[in-house]
A protein has these predicted regions:
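Membrane-interface helix-boundary motifs at transmembrane edges
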Residues: 2-3, 66-74, 144-154, 214-227, ...
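Interfacial loop-to-helix transition and helix-capping segments at the boundaries
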Residues: 36-46, 118-132, 174-205, 240-279
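Transmembrane alpha-helical segments and their boundary/interface "anchor" motifs
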Residues: 39-47, 61-98, 107-125, 136, ...
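Alpha-helical transmembrane segments and terminal signal-anchor/GPI-anchor hydrophobic tails
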Residues: 220-304, 313-318, 322-342
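Hydrophobic cores of alpha-helical transmembrane segments in multi-pass inner/ER membrane proteins
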Residues: 47-56, 128-137, 201-213, 272-283, ...
Length: 413
């Protein structure tokens, strides 16, 4: 049985990812609040996807708690088909796209260059996530063992240790203080692109997702029991992030781009904000789901009474889908729940296609000389979300008619 809270978390994360990428348009208005919302407070999204991935792997790993051996070959075959194949296909697609629209020389089809692009996730700016995800898959036996160690020890204490490690490692990797001038090209590339492939940057979040899968009922019960504390943690993490950015701009003279390069998801503020956001969004989605279900249950008797007697006879039964539509109509919670669920259902394709639509949108703005304002950036965000969703729905229908394309671009048979 699928966990709808985790499923719907994908939709929340996609809204954040699109917010980060539309943030490039927010530079023109030079509005601090707008840029903060899009480029800083949307950065919970990428780490949260690793939380979802950790949850998914632990749910499907039947031998995790028992300690039985993992069939690594079968495990990797499934992951390479589900994630590796779409990554390869979309990387080549974007390389071809940029080769067609950019001047000669910007994209090279030299085999070594293609391998370089694929290894570091440079086909397009959003594809590095897939590289890190594949490295999480490849190194899963290590994290599987770590999960078992944590489970058999004191979980809160081990999570605190992991949190401290994450803070220290992320601080070092973003402030290495190393001079790479004399390094070989290969070593320099591995160091310069470390954020594009090292899974250690998101280890705490990934492991937390795995633990949530093992103890989901306890996890959600704790969120409900301490809902006020969860909201306070979330609000405090937002306040710290916002205060740090405000001080950086007003006191230290940072530009908006400096903010994005400093207070990202790997910064101490960003890590705390990610943890607070995950707890809050899981709590909010649980509340939203229970509210929608309660609304459906309370309206069910009224809906049945309002239907003519003939409609409820054996000759004209009330179908489940019609009943669901009647009971959920007019409910704000149900509408919001359905909107998030729809985004979640198409989140994978939305992730892959939205940079393409954003490039078209930006090109149109440049062509017609449209100058960005706060309202236009906000409208662009809405257009990109809706356009990516519509395009993903069309692609899904097209892929149903071509199984090969479906396998290549979604990893699904």
């Amino acid at each position: 049985m699928r966990n709808t809270i985790i499923d719907n978390l994908r939709g929340i994360c996609m809204l954040g990812v699109i917010g980060i990428h539309i943030g490039s348009l927010a530079l023109a208005p030079n509005n601090f609040t707008l840029y903060l919302l899009l480029e800083i407070l949307s950065r919970y999204s990428v780490p949260s996807f690793f939380f979802i991935s950790g949850y998914g792997l632990s749910c499907t790993d039947k031998g995790l708690l028992s300690g039985s051996r993992l069939n690594y070959i079968d495990f990797m075959k499934k992951r390479l088909r589900g994630a590796g194949l779409p990554y390869l296909s979309w990387s080549l697609f974007y390389m071809l796209y940029f080769w067609l629209i950019l001047p000669p020389g910007f994209v090279s089809w030299n085999p070594l260059h293609v391998a370089y692009v694929l290894f570091f996730g440079l086909g397009c700016y959003h594809l590095y996530f897939m590289v890190i995800l594949l490295w999480f898959y490849a190194s899963y036996p290590l994290w599987r063992r770590l999960l078992r160690i944590i489970i058999h020890q004191n979980i809160p204490f081990m999570l605190v240790l992991l949190f401290i490690f994450q803070l220290a490692f992320n601080w070092w990797t973003t402030h290495p203080g190393l001079n790479t001038a004399g390094w070989s090209v290969l070593a320099k590339n591995f160091f310069d692109y470390r954020l594009n492939y090292l899974p250690l940057h998101y280890l705490l979040i990934f492991i937390s997702g795995g633990l949530a899968a093992c103890y989901w009922e306890k996890f959600i019960a704790l969120l409900r029991r301490y809902s006020t504390i969860v909201c306070i943690i979330f609000a405090a993490s937002v306040a710290w992030d916002v205060q740090s950015c405000y001080e950086a701009v007003t006191v230290k003279g940072y530009t908006l781009i400096d903010l994005a390069n400093t207070y990202h998801q790997l910064s101490p503020q960003g890590l705390c904000y990610t943890v607070g956001s995950l707890l809050f969004f899981c709590l909010a989605l649980d509340w939203l789901e229970r509210r929608a279900q309660a609304k459906a249950h309370t309206e069910a008797p009224k809906a049945l009474q309002s239907i003519p007697q003939a409609a409820t006879t054996p000759e004209a039964p009330l179908s489940g889908s019609c009943h669901r539509k009647v009971t959920e109509r007019g409910s704000l919670a149900s509408l919001l729940y359905k909107a998030i669920s729809t985004l979640s259902a198409y989140s994978m394709l939305i992730y892959f296609v939205h940079p393409l639509l954003l490039d078209w949108l930006s090109s149109a703005y440049n062509h017609f000389g449209i100058i960005m304002t706060v309202k236009k950036v906000a409208l662009s965000y809405v257009l990109l979300v809706l356009g990516s969703l519509a395009f993903s729905i069309l692609l899904t229908k097209a892929f149903e008619k071509c199984s090969t394309a479906k396998l290549l671009f979604t990893g699904k048979r």
